[in-house]
Amino acid sequence: MKSAVILLPGLNRNRDMIAALTKITGQAPVTVWQTDTSIPDDVDLILIPGGFSYGDYLRCGAIAARMPVMQAVREKADKGVMVMGVCNGFQILLEAGLLPGALMRNASLKFVCREVKLEVTNANTSFTRGYKPGQIIRCPVAHHDGNYFADAETLKRLEGEGQVVFRYAEGTNPNGSVNDIAGIVNARGNVLGMMPHPENLIEAAHGGDDGRALFAGALGITA
């Protein structure tokens, strides 16, 4: 199974993402730059890592979402290719219209960097199939604009159709996200956006491997 990591100016978690994918799959992902207009046909998973693309000017992810490479990402997503955006990557997916809702400033108005607990609220997706329903996993967060918001109608649809796949658990919501939402998928289930960083927990020797199953599930391999 082959993966690709999108590179944009200001992203700073691409090395972590590449290292995680290389460790899990045994091969380094291909990298695709902002000005590229296509993504290799044999790619099974596209990842947009975290950071501060274009310095978070205008809005987090707003400029990145309008780069040529994002049209290629849209085309792949429309064909059913798995797409995952983490932190700034989640913000970019929202700005690109690949996921519903918006991410606002943290309720504290401060940058938050700590470990949180996540509840797996839907284990019946290609991303989350390596977990059990209701399982609590550990995951670090590091963001200033992670406060997820959507209007009442959108929230009702997300909750009713099982599109909320991760929720901040046990009072660990770090940003004020509505309904404690930490990660969502699109209606088709092949696009995931989440604020926590699973790529930083894929080896037990480095603090834990709770994030490993997420990548393995998306790629259809054994964790």
From Swiss-Prot:
Pfam families: GATase_5. Transmembrane segments: none annotated. Its EC number is 6.3.5.3, 3.5.1.2. The active site is at C87 (nucleophile), H197, E199. Signal peptide: none annotated. Keywords: ATP-binding, Cytoplasm, Glutamine amidotransferase, Hydrolase, Ligase, Nucleotide-binding, Purine biosynthesis. One of its GO terms (molecular function) is glutaminase activity. It catalyses: N(2)-formyl-N(1)-(5-phospho-beta-D-ribosyl)glycinamide + L-glutamine + ATP + H2O = 2-formamido-N(1)-(5-O-phospho-beta-D-ribosyl)acetamidine + L-glutamate + ADP + phosphate + H(+); L-glutamine + H2O = L-glutamate + NH4(+). It is found in: Cytoplasm. InterPro entries: Class_I_gatase-like, PRibForGlyAmidine_synth_PurQ. One of its GO terms (biological process) is 'de novo' IMP biosynthetic process. Residues 3-223 form the Glutamine amidotransferase type-1 domain. PROSITE patterns: GATASE_TYPE_1 (PS51273). It comes from the Bacteria. Pathway: Purine metabolism; IMP biosynthesis via de novo pathway; 5-amino-1-(5-phospho-D-ribosyl)imidazole from N(2)-formyl-N(1)-(5-phospho-D-ribosyl)glycinamide: step 1/2. GO terms for cellular component: cytoplasm. Part of the phosphoribosylformylglycinamidine synthase complex involved in the purines biosynthetic pathway. Catalyzes the ATP-dependent conversion of formylglycinamide ribonucleotide (FGAR) and glutamine to yield formylglycinamidine ribonucleotide (FGAM) and glutamate. The FGAM synthase complex is composed of three subunits. PurQ produces an ammonia molecule by converting glutamine to glutamate. PurL transfers the ammonia molecule to FGAR to form FGAM in an ATP-dependent manner. Part of the FGAM synthase complex composed of 1 PurL, 1 PurQ and 2 PurS subunits. This is Phosphoribosylformylglycinamidine synthase subunit PurQ. The gene is purQ.
